[in-house]
């Protein structure tokens, strides 16, 4: 089923379809990677789904098989009658579009107790940021370094453009209020303007040294840009997410920590996609790169990957 981000797409799609068809749902235990160290979330973050895991060999099941036809959203066409006749349906694919499950998002999130997990992470790791404006940024490198024809590494320009976009959007939002709104919300606006900004970046341990150097280049690029709010940039703090904790954060905890931030700059990664999607801040600004796949996967249509409220930024 892949890593956490890929699994979440498959999980949410499966449960959403079961709600639509008014059936139960199961996950094959041998496909969940429950015994792997990298999949600790099945005993923590996703532990509620253990009761829906089965030891049955899916090869011996007589269920209707539905295979994803292409990368873009394509409504899953399986009739309830066919599901009843064959005893169930097997889904094969990535299903990487919010449209597969967006209508059932709240119900599914309640089922896996998402809010409880987010609150635990927030209390443990986010306290120091409560009085700041926080932008999370995910840098995806790792195995991408060896498969850039499929998954390109997003360059510094994207992160510079995204920070500029977020800051200008905030300023335009404040300046665009009418007189009555400004009067009623004066205190709120004042607090927004005086809050310090924190750029909280996330990466794998093996990439930290390289990302640390890239952060310095990003800071320099912002300072040299004539369109940047220089005072804001000079006062912006750049920190590695979860780096100051005594205990190493699991990957699912880092994902949820990103979701607690005010705004999100995601990489071309299903992992940080979910961090932004889980963010329940009504005023969040989400930036995603215009290049999601490399030339070898240029046939993958990503038009339905991200919600329309998110912002495609040049990378």
Model-predicted segments: where are they?
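A short, glycine/small-residue-rich beta-strand->loop->alpha-helix junction that serves as a flexible
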Residues: 1-9
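Donor-binding and catalytic core of enzymes assembling or modifying cell-surface/extracellular glycoconjugates
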Residues: 4, 197-297
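Short catalytic/ligand-binding loop motif for oxyanion handling, primarily in non-cytosolic enzymes
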Residues: 6, 33-40, 100, 144-147, ...
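A short beta-strand-loop structural module common to alpha/beta enzyme folds
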Residues: 23-33
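Cationic, low-complexity basic patches in intrinsically disordered or flexible, solvent-exposed regions
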Residues: 181-182, 186-187, 191-192
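Leloir-type glycosyltransferase catalytic cores
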Residues: 295-315
